[in-house]
Regions:
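Conserved N-terminal beta1-alpha1 strand-loop-helix module at the mouth
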Residues: 1-89, 93-100, 104-110
Length: 112
């Protein structure tokens, strides 16, 4: 039987105390940290981008599960990979060629 993975979202964090909240979920036993990236186009909300992911990577000791809820995710995969994403997920309806995007993600050494 496979292990259940706990990946709490940072959207419920206090962004004024983001590092503290990240440490709280890590200390509580979270396996991954889920980061929802929203662009205001693919979904109506806007959240965080590459600089915040890079900052989170500096203070987090667990893998970053970056969820791209954006249009044209292929344009941003390299930047999020370089910012420290360990896992990148995207919405199949946001791309024309799902396998090409998976291959692109993996080409940066990131899980898809």
């Amino acid at each position: 039987m496979s292990k259940t993975i706990i990946s709490p979202s940072i959207l419920s964090a206090d962004f004024a105390n983001l590092e503290r909240d990240i440490k709280l979920v890590e200390n509580a036993g979270a396996d991954w940290l889920h980061v929802d990236v929203m662009d205001g186009h693919f979904v109506p909300n806007i959240t965080i981008g590459v600089p915040v992911v890079a900052s989170i990577k500096k203070v987090s000791s667990i893998p970053l599960d970056v969820h791209l809820m954006i249009e044209n995710p292929e344009k941003y995969i390299e930047a999020f990979a370089k910012a420290g994403a360990d896992i990148l997920t995207f919405h199949y309806e946001a791309v024309n060629d799902v396998q090409a995007i998976i291959d692109l993600i993996k080409s940066y050494g990131v899980k898809a």
